[in-house]
Design a protein with these regions (language model features):
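A short, mixed-charge helix-start or loop-turn motif at secondary-structure junctions
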Residues: 56-60, 123, 131
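Gly/Ser-enriched beta-turn/beta-hairpin loop segments
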Residues: 112-113, 119-127
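A short glycine-rich beta-turn/N-cap micro-motif
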Residues: 1-8, 20-29, 45-54, 71-79, ...
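Short, flexible loop/turn elements at secondary-structure junctions
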Residues: 58, 134-136, 150
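Short turn/helix-capping motifs enriched in Asx and small/polar residues
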Residues: 84-86, 91-114, 140-143, 147-149, ...
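Extended charged/polar low-complexity repeat regions
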Residues: 6-15, 25-27, 32-38, 51-53, ...
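A structural detector for short beta-strand units
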Residues: 1-4, 12-19, 36-44, 63-71, ...
Length: 173
C-alpha cells in the first residue's frame, strides 16, 4: 500500500506477519506461525502519530491486554508496562526494559523480572517493535524503519536515500 510493507515472512517460512496500514501508520499486525494466528497487535498512537503502546490479543480470546510505553527525553522506548484493571484501581506492571548505545544499537533487552531475553524469544520485549527514538525495529535485519527509509545502527547510516520530489528546478531549486 503506497510503498509500505504489508507482509513479512522469514526465509524458512516459519512465520508470516501481516500489517494493516491506516494512513502513515501500521494500525495492526497479525503474526502467523504453525498454520494459524499466534497473536494480533493493535498499535496505539497519540495525536502527533507517535506510538504510545499496543493492545494484544491471543487466538480464541475476546480479551485485549494493553501495554504502554515509557520513553526517555529522546523518545527512546525504555520500558513497556502492562495495564491491569480499569479506572483508579488500574495498575501497571513492568513487562520489558530496553537500553541502547548513542547510535541505536540495543545494549540490553530484559523481561519484567530483569532477565535478559533474545530478539527471537516469545516475550513482550521481543514482540514490541517500537524501540530507539520510537522507531520500528526489525529484529530480522537489525534495522529501524523511519516512515520513509531504513537506518542501520551498526554503520550509523541510512541504507536508502530520502524520496525526491521534483520541483522542476532540480535539487537546488
Amino acid at each position: 500500500v503506497n510503498g509500505r510493507r504489508t507482509r513479512k515472512s522469514n526465509a524458512d517460512g516459519g512465520y508470516t506477519e501481516y500489517y494493516i496500514i491506516d494512513g502513515l501508520a501500521v494500525a495492526e499486525r497479525r503474526y502467523y506461525s504453525g498454520g494459524g494466528v499466534q497473536y494480533t497487535l493493535r498499535y496505539l498512537y497519540d495525536e502527533s502519530n507517535n506510538p504510545v503502546g499496543f493492545g494484544m490479543q491471543y487466538p480464541n480470546s475476546t480479551r485485549w491486554t494493553n501495554y504502554y510505553f515509557e520513553k526517555n527525553v529522546q523518545g527512546d522506548v525504555i520500558g513497556v508496562y502492562q495495564k491491569e484493571g480499569d479506572g483508579n484501581s488500574a495498575t501497571h506492571i513492568l513487562a520489558a526494559r530496553y537500553s541502547y548505545d548513542p547510535y541505536g544499537n540495543p545494549t540490553s533487552m530484559t523481561n519484567g523480572a530483569g532477565t535478559a531475553v533474545s530478539q527471537t524469544s516469545n516475550t513482550i520485549a521481543a514482540i514490541n517493535p517500537f524501540r530507539y527514538r520510537g522507531y520500528r525495529y526489525d529484529g530480522d535485519t537489525g534495522l529501524y524503519y523511519l516512515q520513509s527509509r531504513y537506518y542501520d545502527p551498526v554503520s550509523c547510516r541510512f541504507v536508502n536515500a530520502d524520496k525526491y520530489a521534483s520541483t522542476g528546478q532540480g535539487i537546488t531549486g
